[in-house]
């Protein structure tokens, strides 16, 4: 074999190796980037197909819901059902949660209340704060009438809401006390967090941009095992099923309140 042919052969092998590497890297990178999410354009295509099959239209979906569909796979059924169910007012009965030994996970986009108005939006998009306070109140008092819809109306009546946005932090501190809870804001201190979780005190936190939100979001810390914390994310059963490293959360937490039953 001539030297030129050997060089051409090695060149072809090198090209194949590079192409294979690019293909593998491309697939791997896409998997990391999407992490279950999808693009807005892809979400629009999926919703358009679904709408055609169910006698609705893509135009029936507000842009904010299309974005929710794209970024949160857990909420996709809620988004798909919006045109058909947005005007329904189903009965809300959480009596099965009375006496719960753990903080119940409630989702802001539960179809029983998620389509109802809140803050010039809907609870499913803007109701994380009231939903967190609802979880803690039901757990601490056993009063299952304080569901997320009730809590949103409570927030509006007492001006704890921010029209066009979310909820004021005062919803947790002042609002919690108005509901008969003992609410204490605490510093970001691991030992204090762990001590409260060890005795069953839920901790409502506000987090900034990071694993849970691009803006601001409320969560309920519910327990821990060593430095791993369990939490209820009102926007994600997936996040709620994980254990989170305390240091990971600490870099995102902006405020914390310990809640107890007063008296």
What are the residue ranges of the model-derived segments?
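Active-site-adjacent structural segments surrounding the nucleophilic cysteine of cysteine proteases
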Residues: 3, 11-18, 24-160
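Low-complexity, intrinsically disordered short peptide segments enriched in small/polar/basic residues
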Residues: 14-15, 20, 201, 255
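Conserved active-site-adjacent core of cysteine acyl-enzyme catalytic domains
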Residues: 25-52, 93-94, 101, 138, ...
